[in-house]
């Protein structure tokens, strides 16, 4: 092994402890694991290949779902993203995909084949009523932030089979509205002529915690504002696009970083940082790493959409 490579390996090992040398956290710690502070700027985040959101800015914490366990990048169910402040945009197409795949995908779901488009500051939602012989429907409405932090879609115009209806309840009927308002349909409820969406429940893992304080239609995107904008964050001096993590413990692959000081930096600042947690390892391998005098890591990361060979399936162990 040449001297340069040997020196690099030694530096790398200073930051990490191999998993084989770690006791089982559930057996060794009787105290709660410290939350990991997180900040993001201008990130295109993939929940799945088609379900993508644009994180304009974000400050919050990664909370282990098991208080005595670690945040594990290879297990999206191991943590929740608690938002202190964020601005996140999701396209109409991506939201329709979320509703079709995550909310109304179960056998007997009342709605199917949903599509969403924007017109001026309105949303147009189309679909079929499964329990009414797949009758097509269309509703046009406005968005607002509910007092409890959910999103309210107020239906102004409703049609079924191209015929105007009095309102959403007239379209659905009492029985269908009651079916939507059960625990079978996660994150969606009906209140009179309004459809209420809960971002905490409708999105795939990793799940978020946070209250929507404002929402608007901007072009083909639905822009959600969570919390109150912060004056600064711990990574504010970092230029460009990034995902930053500080404090707490993080495990990824065979390595664990204690008292984390990790920033993943976009190698191409010309567009948003395209990041897919299911394939973070492929993105890391395509980049390079630098260490800081304070034992932190700065990982210059390739955009997912710029990988030469895009993975076709998730890596083993992804959940």
Predicted regions located by residue number:
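Bacterial N-terminal signal peptides that target proteins for export
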Residues: 1-9
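Short, intrinsically disordered, low-complexity terminal segments
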Residues: 5-6, 20-23
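Bacterial N-terminal signal peptides
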Residues: 10-18
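Extracellular/lumenal and peripheral-membrane lipid-interaction modules
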Residues: 24-319
